[in-house]
């Protein structure tokens, strides 16, 4: 079931976008809807009814439906054939439990449950994935004419039409007419019947498997049995409440993933269980599985419950989350210039369409260095994550070396009491330094900017202080947890009998708690980013107000409880008193850090803007009786008074502590001052007879790159090859700009297959000119729309099957034909240099009917020859720098626009206009830009640089600055020597 209600805060933007997009099609919309109610009646009815909107803008009334349990088991609800089929299948499951021998019940029902769980997570997941990305399920319904009235003669299966019509109208007696409902809604109704079967069989087979495995330990007492059954029943009841409350909030629309098919035109609610936990139906909504495992007292049931839960999380990450982000969390519109001049836009479009040459106006005043963001550091070279490890960075190398030492010492030393004590003491030291030492530094930074002042005193910038702090914090955190893991390993001994007592259960619980802490840490980092993770608001100006997103939507301080679940998991796994004391110390110090370091700083920055209660706290307090609420308020007062007392005590002792810390820093500073193969199936059409390749043709048009064409001959060739080539015909080689859209025009006989398609390939990738042997990798467009189930196949079609009569062939005969046009842009292009061609293929197969002329995509190198000013990038003259920077900006702007697909939402129209937000979200755009910059200027940047610079002017400034810095080490052609001539100086 979909958890789209969690994105309700973005639903207004969604409706505004849909309304704006459909405002120009009101007449067509009204015609499709049959009779849309007048505006006044529409507003009155809207309070009572729910209205849906299909992707093409059709508005319809969404009738009321009921959940699957009520439909199947409530005798008051109408029944039909599909209900009978589901009930019969469920009855067969129950019958099998009693019919099978005892030795076969467990394995058979384990296989049955895993089958239905696979149908759920893999089967339904696949269907939803292709529906979200390609509208494939609706396309199947259209292709098979499932909902086409047999009266039209287009439905080859009228019996199936009548069956589906009877099934759906029986279930929905009000506000629903099968013939008038949109195809998306009818398809969703059929889809949910399949979902009903899978979900009911999934849960039933799980319960039957638990019954087959159920039992009681032979040595279990009455008290333990009562506790086990009581806890299990509580978890099952809690699970039931979560499901019922979730269904109350999201209704059948989100329960059956309705937003994969259509959208409802109303406010999405956000309350109840959705304030308690993220994705409650997939997280806390599976508590009942563990309750049933406890009642069954079976590790087999627990194991299969964990497998099912993990599969459900995989379903969430792979299927639902991408769809939710795409549907309810679109990128915000790009910030355009306040007063963009028409000349800016015209100039940008002219540069993007054709580049005949560059002209630069001489300005006596040097161009100012573009101001970079100084309020917060640029997130370019992050520390966190395996993907950000950089062996050229001293912090990463130091951490890897220290981790290597910890691993070697842990592995090579015996687990004697002496070594165990040393490892525990080492872990205790790192925890004290991580919580107390860094806490004191942050407290001094918050009140007196101590850390920043130290670096400014020696001439460094605030960003240098920030980098050094991040390195220290990252190293301290890594060593804190590495030393704790090492101590845990030393105190751990592999059990000799896993079935003894609660040994296996302790390991399962411990592993679960460790996983919970890892998930919490990832969620915190995703919510806060690098800046928040390293307490950036202690060092830089803070935001005007706090935003609570991600895990902070439900908890104010996740680190307080679940953020330390892993250390208590280690206690369960080891069963060691020393690890218990270490975990207790860690938890206490973390709570103290939050209370005495982070909380005062946040109150000083944000004051009353701080949220008093999180979503989980609100949900729990609402469910408490009044007496407990009153007692809770008294406890809060006592804790607050105790906190004030401790703060006063620390204020009195702070001067002595500060003096001691200063001494440690001074002594430490003095000490350190001394010291792939892929299988491809090629489909060949058997019906090529009667199709003449001479009747097909493919021609192309694109944005020519004349500067790249003129640079084919350089001084690197022999003397004869340096002479300009004299052509014997009027042919001009096709050289196009990097990333510029390419228009393809094709002709074909009138009887050509509607499934024909055109793909883009590298010339060197295909040895055969008759059959294409490699896949197109998505770089293809159909010649006729709506012939393929994949919607990207139609993206790019401009003209299709336009009839042309009387074409004269080479043999003198005339013949009618059809023609079409399509455009290849964005992901349908190769984002690299090379020689390419377009191939026209027959009938959805790989038989080639026509091939375009080969064309080249090149990135022209920026040097003195493509600039009208006689200067170099490494010039020291200020006026020269101004001129060359302007030249770089103008050369870079059309390339950046091409790299951003010339999308008006993200591509800039001028050098000062900021990039769209999607550039920061989708890494392909920055990677395209840095690839082009590398070939244009010989400078290699990381993609994060493009995100951080934010516009063409900043990027051009960075390129010029990098060229100046790297000039002495450049090996490119230059007008002078790059290094001084020592002998010449001596002479």
UniProtKB/Swiss-Prot annotation:
Topological domain ranges for the Cytoplasmic compartment: 105-107, 215-221, 293-298, 415-421, 505-507, 582-987
Bias (Polar residues) ranges: 1-12, 19-28
GO biological process, one term: methylation
Residue ranges, annotated region (Disordered): 1-56, 327-348
Compartments in which it is found: Endoplasmic reticulum membrane
Cysteine disulfide partners in this protein: none
Annotated family: Belongs to the class VI-like SAM-binding methyltransferase superfamily. CHO2 family.
Protein name, UniProt field: Phosphatidylethanolamine N-methyltransferase
Organism: Botryotinia fuckeliana (strain B05.10) (Noble rot fungus)
């Amino acid at each position: 079931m979909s958890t789209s209600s969690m994105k309700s805060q973005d639903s207004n933007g969604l409706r505004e976008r849909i309304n704006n997009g459909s405002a120009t099609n009101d007449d067509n919309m009204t015609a499709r809807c049959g009779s849309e109610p007048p505006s006044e009646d529409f507003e009155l009815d809207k309070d009572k009814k729910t209205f849906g909107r299909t992707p093409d803008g059709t508005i319809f009334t969404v009738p009321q439906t009921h959940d699957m349990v009520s439909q199947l088991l409530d005798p008051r609800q109408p029944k039909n054939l599909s209900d009978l089929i589901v009930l019969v299948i469920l009855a067969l499951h129950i019958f099998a439990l009693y019919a099978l021998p005892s030795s076969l019940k467990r394995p058979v029902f384990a296989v049955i449950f895993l089958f239905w769980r696979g149908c759920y997570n893999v089967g339904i997941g696949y269907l939803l994935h292709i529906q979200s990305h390609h509208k494939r399920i609706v396309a199947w319904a259209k292709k098979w004419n499932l909902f086409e009235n047999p009266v039209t003669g287009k439905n080859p299966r009228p019996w199936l039409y009548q069956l589906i019509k009877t099934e759906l109208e029986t279930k929905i007696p009000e506000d629903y007419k099968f013939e008038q409902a949109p195809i998306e809604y009818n398809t969703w109704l059929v889809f949910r019947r399949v979902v009903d079967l899978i979900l009911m069989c999934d849960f039933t087979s799980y319960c039957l498997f638990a019954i087959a495995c159920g039992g009681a330990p032979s040595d279990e007492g009455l008290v333990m049995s009562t506790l086990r059954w009581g806890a299990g029943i509580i978890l099952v009841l809690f699970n039931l409440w979560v499901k019922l409350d979730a269904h109350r909030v999201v209704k059948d629309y989100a329960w059956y993933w309705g937003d994969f098919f259509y959208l409802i035109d109303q406010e999405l609610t956000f309350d109840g269980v959705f304030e308690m936990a993220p994705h409650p139906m997939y997280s806390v909504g599976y508590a009942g599985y563990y309750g049933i495992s406890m009642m069954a007292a079976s590790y087999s049931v627990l194991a299969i419950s964990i497998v099912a839960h993990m599969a459900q999380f995989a379903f969430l990450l792979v299927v639902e989350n991408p769809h939710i982000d795409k549907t309810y969390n679109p990128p915000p519109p790009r910030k355009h210039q306040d007063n963009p001049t028409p000349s800016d836009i015209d100039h940008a479009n002219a540069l993007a369409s054709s580049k005949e040459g560059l002209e630069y106006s001489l300005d006596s005043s040097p161009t100012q260095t573009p101001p970079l963001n100084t309020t917060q550091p640029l997130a370019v070279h992050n520390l966190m994550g395996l993907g950000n490890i950089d062996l050229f960075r001293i912090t990463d190398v130091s951490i890897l070396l220290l981790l290597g030492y910890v691993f070697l010492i842990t592995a090579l030393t015996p687990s004697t009491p002496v070594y165990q004590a040393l490892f525990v003491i080492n872990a205790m030291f790192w925890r004290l330094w991580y919580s107390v030492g860094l806490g004191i530094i942050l407290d001094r930074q918050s009140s007196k900017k101590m850390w920043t002042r130290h670096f400014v005193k020696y001439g460094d910038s605030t960003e240098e202080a920030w980098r050094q702090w991040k390195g220290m914090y990252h190293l301290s955190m890594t060593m804190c947890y590495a030393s704790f893991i090492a101590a845990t390993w030393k105190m751990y001994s592999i059990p000799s009998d896993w079935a003894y007592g609660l040994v296996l259960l302790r390991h399962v619980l411990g592993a679960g708690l460790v996983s919970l802490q890892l998930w919490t840490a990832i969620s915190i980092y995703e919510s806060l980013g690098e800046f928040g993770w390293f307490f950036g608001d202690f060092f830089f100006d803070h935001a005007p107000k706090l935003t609570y997103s991600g895990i902070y939507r439900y908890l104010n301080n996740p680190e307080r409880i679940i953020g330390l679940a892993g250390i208590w998991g280690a206690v369960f796994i080891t069963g060691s008193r020393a690890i218990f004391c270490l975990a207790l110390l860690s938890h206490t110090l973390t709570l103290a850090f939050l209370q005495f370091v982070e909380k005062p700083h946040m109150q000083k920055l944000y004051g009353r803007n701080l949220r008093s209660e999180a979503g989980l706290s609100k949900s729990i307090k609402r469910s408490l009786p009044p007496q407990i609420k009153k007692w809770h308020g008294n406890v809060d007062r006592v804790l607050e008074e105790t906190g004030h007392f401790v703060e006063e005590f620390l204020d009195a002792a702070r001067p002595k502590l500060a003096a001691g810390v200063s001494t440690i820093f001074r002594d430490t500073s003095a000490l350190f001052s001394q010291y792939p193969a892929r299988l491809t199936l090629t489909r060949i059409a058997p019906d090529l007879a009667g199709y003449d390749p001479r009747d097909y043709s493919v021609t192309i048009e694109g944005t020519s790159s004349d500067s790249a064409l003129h640079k084919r001959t350089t001084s690197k060739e022999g003397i004869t090859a340096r002479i300009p080539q004299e052509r014997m015909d009027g042919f001009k080689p096709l050289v196009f700009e990097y990333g510029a859209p390419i228009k393809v025009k094709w002709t074909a006989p009138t009887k050509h297959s509607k499934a024909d398609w055109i793909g883009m390939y590298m010339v060197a990738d295909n040895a055969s000119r008759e059959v294409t042997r490699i896949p197109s990798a998505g770089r293809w467009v159909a010649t006729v729309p709506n012939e393929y189930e994949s919607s990207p196949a139609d993206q790019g079609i401009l003209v299709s099957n336009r009839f042309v009569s009387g074409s004269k062939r080479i043999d003198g005969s005339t013949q009618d034909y059809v023609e079409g046009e399509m455009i290849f842009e964005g992901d349908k292009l190769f984002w690299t240099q090379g020689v390419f061609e377009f191939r026209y293929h027959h009938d959805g197969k790989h038989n080639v009917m026509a091939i375009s002329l080969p064309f080249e995509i090149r990135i022209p190198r920026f040097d003195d020859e493509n600039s009208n000013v006689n200067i170099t990038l490494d010039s020291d003259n200020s006026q020269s720098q101004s001129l060359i920077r302007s030249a770089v900006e103008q050369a870079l702007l059309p390339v950046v626009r091409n790299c951003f697909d010339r999308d008006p939402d993200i591509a800039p129209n001028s050098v000062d206009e900021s990039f769209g937000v999607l550039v920061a979200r989708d890494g392909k755009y920055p990677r395209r830009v840095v690839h082009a910059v590398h070939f244009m200027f010989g400078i290699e940047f990381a993609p994060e640089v493009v995100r951080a610079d934010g516009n063409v002017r900043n990027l051009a400034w960075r390129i010029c600055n990098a060229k100046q810095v790297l000039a002495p080490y450049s090996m490119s052609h230059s007008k002078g020597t790059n290094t001084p001539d020592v002998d010449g100086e001596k002479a």
